[in-house]
Amino acid sequence: MLRFVGTGASHVGLVRDHNEDAAFSSPYLALVADGVGGAAAGEVASATAAYVVAATTRAHPEQDPVVVLGDAIRRAVVDLHRGVALDPERRGMATTLTALATDGHRVVLAHIGDSRAYLLRDGQLSRVSHDHTLVQALVDSGDITAESVRHHPMRNVVMRSLHAGAGDEADLQPDIHVLDARSGDRFLVCSDGLTDMVEDRAVAHIVSTRDAETATRDLVQAALDGGGRDNVTVLVVDLLDDPQTVRLSGDGQLLGALRDPRNVVDPGTLQRP
């Protein structure tokens, strides 16, 4: 049975006064959510989305992760709406979400926003998620080069996220697809607090030359050394076919805003209509 084995870390950074990133790492799920900058209660949005997806996948560890992730994300959006109903000052809260889930046989990616997932195989690091940002759309259309993205003035404009506001339903739809994954692969899941601060070549070098724990620590430190202008969250997990390792991995690691239960909207505190 395929399972994830690795670790994660989340740091508030050197500029922000609180952490709006939330993450969860377990043998069956590696997830990062980043409260969208400037929106009210970003930490509530990210922690709630992370909690709902983690709880749902934990309850159905051997079911089709395509279905489980899709259902979980829809439930997360419902809870974001509940959060606004409980506290109207949260109106406008939103979050990215990038999650890798396995049922023991395959790995599925669910992604919305600009947090990222990467695959390391045979020493080569490649991105398996596609940013839902204005600058990525400009790259896709050929209007700017990929090399110019990190310094573009509009690089932080997110076009799709999970939110509780009005708007086009398509803006809430994540990309969900099965990855070509095999035992021995390594995955990096991270918030843009890493990728905005650290060049891709440096990220690839760290991920490919360290064990998971050291790579996680060194990636966070590299983001801080690069300026630490945002919260930074990093998960480095290896995909292994090793039941004994899975048993030793525990139920999961909670990181960032997810560590504070006050950030999670309680789905039982508001009656369904």
Protein language model features and the residues they cover:
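PP2C/PPM-type serine/threonine phosphatase catalytic domain
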Residues: 1-273
